[in-house]
């Protein structure tokens, strides 16, 4: 198998044409329709998926990495990102709720995403491309030899697959796999790429070494961020505006149970994220404490930095007293027994508890977003160590303009000696 190696230093020397094939740059705030009008017949499709055990909030982070890759591709050719349908996530455990093949529009505002990069839903891809076929699937993997000490280099090589493929050929020699729950989807070719580096490292390969019109990158979490914490990162993160119907549910809950509205809380939210540039600390937040208390697998997976329920309640009461707050909103994945114990210890706590009909409508992912939206508007927030759920709340509060001192806080383990608080990643416009 031919080796296709692109070292980071070489990638930096590549001279990309300054404009897309249509003669236009794609920039934040531009409509996808502006650049892609009439281009469906010639544009190429980028698809991706993530390791099945990874959760909702890590997958949102992978989207940001893939968006960087798409921006690199757009400098040379017309590409569009096909949004991977949601479903079959470990943390989505509500029984009797159909939670596969969920389009992104259930959770996010697609026009907002399209102001950053051109995106379409998977079913639109099927309609445009002529059927449920993906020309080339690349399974991303690490290097078998690992990273050796010395100078870090970014590279990508076509290599033999290290692990057994989760794809199998049918009698027509098409590849069958999970494909987001779409059983009719088939891959025409599957091969493995060893990658070490940021997402854009695979751009030369996609542009020069395959003519496939539709390309899927499986195990995309193996790619790193191009510019973590930079303007491009924040442009993409800001574009990930929650779906309006979920925000409205959260806003109604804030108003009814927490005496919180954007006007009263000094939060200047705008529907168009490209026009929303807020000075940090200018927003006050609602008159309540926001809490994310991760339990379940974190109890045994992160024993040192996750408190007991009693320890968590002591910290909550201390914060409420310090900040003169008499309301507390808690987002938690605690099992029923633990939740009942928490309620006894903290009877004044408020929680968003959907009815079965609401759960069926919003699904577990929508409920998680509502929880995050409410926590993001709190006067003061405290989260759980190394939880991506808490990380996403940090980012949302940064976008809304709340004081970082009220955002980057976490619970400490009961016996934890050095309780390092989360790093402040300042928003960049």
Swiss-Prot record:
Reactions catalysed: L-seryl-[protein] + GDP-beta-L-fucose = 3-O-(alpha-L-fucosyl)-L-seryl-[protein] + GDP + H(+); L-threonyl-[protein] + GDP-beta-L-fucose = 3-O-(alpha-L-fucosyl)-L-threonyl-[protein] + GDP + H(+)
GO molecular function terms listed in the Swiss-Prot or TrEMBL record: peptide-O-fucosyltransferase activity
Glycosylation, residue list: 189, 209, 259
Signal peptide positions on this chain: 1-21
InterPro entries in the cross-refs: GDP-Fuc_O-FucTrfase, OFUT2-like
Example GO BP: fucose metabolic process
Cysteine pairings via disulfide bonds: 161-192, 412-419
Subcellular location: Endoplasmic reticulum; Golgi apparatus
GO cellular component: a single term: endoplasmic reticulum
Pathway recorded for this protein: Protein modification; protein glycosylation
Positions with a binding annotation for GDP-beta-L-fucose: 53-57, 292-294, 371, 388-389
Catalytic center residues: 54 (proton acceptor)
Keyword Acetylation tagged: no
Keywords: Carbohydrate metabolism, Disulfide bond, Endoplasmic reticulum, Fucose metabolism, Glycoprotein, Glycosyltransferase, Golgi apparatus, Signal, Transferase
Entry's EC annotation: 2.4.1.221
Marked site positions, Essential for catalytic activity: 396
Domain of life, source organism: Eukaryota
Family: Belongs to the glycosyltransferase 68 family.
Entry function: Catalyzes the reaction that attaches fucose through an O-glycosidic linkage to a conserved serine or threonine residue in the consensus sequence C1-X-X-S/T-C2 of thrombospondin type I repeats (TSRs) where C1 and C2 are the first and second cysteines of the repeat, respectively. O-fucosylates members of several protein families including the ADAMTS, the thrombospondin (TSP) and spondin families. Required for the proper secretion of ADAMTS family members such as ADAMTSL1 and ADAMTS13.
Name this protein carries in UniProt: GDP-fucose protein O-fucosyltransferase 2
Phylogenetic placement of the source organism: Eukaryota, Metazoa, Chordata, Craniata, Vertebrata
């Amino acid at each position: 198998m031919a080796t296709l190696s692109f070292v980071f230093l070489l990638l930096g020397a590549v001279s990309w044409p300054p404009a897309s094939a249509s003669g236009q740059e794609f920039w934040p705030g531009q409509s996808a329709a502006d650049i892609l009008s009439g281009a469906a017949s010639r544009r190429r499709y980028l698809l991706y998926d993530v390791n099945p055990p990874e959760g909702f909030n890590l997958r949102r982070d992978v989207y940001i990495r893939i968006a960087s890759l798409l921006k690199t591709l757009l400098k040379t050719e017309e590409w569009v990102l096909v949004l991977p349908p949601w479903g079959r996530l470990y943390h989505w455990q509500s029984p009797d709720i159909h939670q596969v093949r969920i389009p992104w529009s259930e959770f996010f505002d697609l026009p907002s995403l399209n102001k950053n990069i051109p995106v379409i839903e998977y079913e639109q891809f099927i309609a445009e491309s002529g059927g449920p076929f993906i020309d080339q699937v690349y399974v991303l993997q690490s290097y078998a030899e690992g990273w050796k000490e010395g100078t870090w280099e970014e590279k990508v090589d076509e290599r033999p697959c290290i692990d057994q493929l989760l794809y199998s050929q049918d009698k027509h020699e098409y590849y069958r796999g999970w494909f987001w729950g779409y059983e009719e989807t088939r891959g025409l070719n599957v091969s493995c790429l060893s990658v070490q580096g940021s997402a854009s490292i695979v751009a030369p390969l996609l542009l020069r070494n395959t003519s496939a019109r539709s390309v899927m990158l499986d195990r995309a979490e193996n790619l790193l961020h191009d510019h973590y914490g930079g303007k491009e990162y924040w442009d993409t993160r800001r574009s990930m505006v929650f779906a309006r119907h979920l925000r409205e549910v959260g806003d109604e809950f804030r108003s009814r149970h927490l005496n919180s509205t954007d006007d009263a809380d000094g939060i200047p939210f705008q529907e168009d994220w490209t026009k929303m540039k807020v000075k940090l600390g200018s927003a006050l937040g609602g008159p309540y404490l926001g809490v994310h208390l991760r339990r379940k697998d974190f109890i045994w997976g992160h024993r040192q930095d996750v408190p007991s329920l009693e320890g968590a309640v002591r910290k909550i009461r201390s914060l409420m007293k310090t900040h003169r707050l008499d309301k507390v909103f808690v987002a938690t994945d605690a099992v029923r027994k633990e939740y009942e114990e928490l309620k006894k210890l903290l009877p004044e706590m408020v929680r968003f508890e959907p009815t079965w009909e609401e759960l069926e409508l919003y699904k577990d992912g929508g409920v998680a977003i509502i929880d995050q939206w409410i926590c993001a508007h709190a006067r003061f927030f405290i989260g759980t160590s190394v939880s991506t759920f808490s990380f996403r709340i940090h980012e949302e509060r940064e976008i809304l303009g709340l004081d970082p001192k009220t955002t980057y806080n976490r619970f400490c383990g009961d016996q934890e000696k050095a309780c390092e608080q989360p790093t402040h990643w300042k928003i960049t416009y």
